[in-house]
Design a protein with these regions (language model features):
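GST-like domain detector, emphasizing the conserved glutathione-binding G-site
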Residues: 1-129, 133
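GST-like fold's C-terminal all-alpha helical module
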Residues: 101-199
């Protein structure tokens, strides 16, 4: 089994890295250097036609792309500690917050990175800068909304337990900071949550 992956700050691979650390699992990693465009090489594109990391190669030579799909694959074989919910309602809350984090925060964050960051202009010379700037506002509003949601005193995003939803949001928040879109100062609940999950050994190790 091999995990084709990239190091920090790549946010999607990091989701899998944190998940594996929480599970105490070790998987052989193949460092796929994105700055060298190794993920766009013809041989890699046979593993994932979208040319993206992470990609998991299973023991029988099959390939799984997308970070959540990879983590769900591992969850089937290693259900403890449960990262996708402990009962039907809990599982629904985890799924709800994964989707909310992806749609509300990750989507505008990605547009800021693609259309408003000078580091991506090399591979995307036709940036829509106005849309990128607009996405900064959408991203900030998403963070403020999550801050309000966390105002009910819950310890973690989907409830009382640390789950995959926390991993998704953490990796998004940290990558947003990498592209100079940090959490608003007036988001105390989000900042307190971020401090809690960032203190976990799995986050510190990745």
């Amino acid at each position: 089994m091999k995990l084709y992956t990239e190091n920090y700050p790549a946010p999607n691979p990091r989701k899998v890295h944190i998940y594996l650390a929480e599970k105490g699992l070790t998987v052989d990693r193949v460092h796929t250097k994105m700055q060298e465009r190794q993920h766009k090489a013809p041989e890699f594109m046979k593993k994932n036609s979208l040319g993206q990391v992470p990609v998991l190669e299973t023991e029988d030579g099959k390939f799984i792309s997308e970070s959540i799909a990879i983590c769900r694959y591992f969850e089937t074989f290693h259900p403890a500690p449960p990262m996708f919910g402990r009962d039907p309602f809990d599982a629904a809350m985890v799924e709800m917050w994964i989707r909310r984090a992806e749609f509300r925060l990750w989507n505008p964050m990605g547009q800021v990175w693609i259309n408003a960051d000078p580091r991506t202009a090399i591979v995307n010379p036709n940036q829509f800068k106005d849309y990128g700037e607009h996405s900064k506002k959408v991203l900030a509003n998403a963070m403020k909304w999550i801050d309000r949601e966390l105002g009910d005193g819950r310890e973690f995003l989907a409830g009382a337990h640390y789950t995959m939803a926390d991993i998704v949001l953490l990796c998004g928040i940290d990558f947003a900071k990498f592209i100079h879109q940090d959490m608003p100062d007036d988001a105390p609940n989000l900042r307190a949550w971020h401090a809690r999950v960032s203190a976990r050994p799995s986050a510190r190790a990745t």
